[in-house]
């Protein structure tokens, strides 16, 4: 369950910079920025919902190096909440009979997802105003 807070704000770039800086204070964070402005003439607006989606802090995590997609499915079905994470290149070895063991330099698992405590959604409403929604886990 999440409690929602909405704010009308100005200066989207300033807010995005603050979100990125704030992400450094958490062990678990993810900041996703839209490239809609780069492709505005070519991309229908209905395909773009948010200019920025960010996740901070962690309620639960999933790390896997085997049977990863099955574990992700169970994790998702149990949590029924926002998930942020990453997939490694070597995860392909679980899909086909392939073998590689690429060193990523940070010893990340093949699959990693977390349920964030906070989700921030930033949407451009018009040229002068933006809407920031904060979804806090309760």
Predicted regions and their residues:
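Signature of the chorismate-utilizing enzyme
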Residues: 1-138
């Amino acid at each position: 369950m999440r409690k929602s807070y909405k704010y009308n704000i100005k200066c989207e770039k300033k807010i995005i910079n603050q979100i990125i800086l704030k992400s450094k204070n958490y062990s678990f964070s993810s900041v996703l920025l839209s490239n809609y402005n780069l492709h505005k003439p070519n991309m229908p607006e209905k395909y773009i919902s948010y200019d920025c989606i960010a996740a901070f802090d962690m309620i639960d995590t999933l790390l896997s190096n085997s049977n990863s997609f099955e574990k992700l499915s169970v994790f998702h079905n149990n949590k029924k909440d926002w998930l942020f994470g990453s997939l490694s290149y070597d995860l392909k070895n679980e899909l086909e009979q392939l073998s590689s063991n690429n060193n990523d330099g940070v010893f990340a698992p093949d699959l990693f997802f977390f349920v964030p405590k906070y989700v921030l959604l930033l949407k451009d409403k018009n040229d002068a105003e933006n809407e920031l929604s904060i979804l806090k886990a309760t």
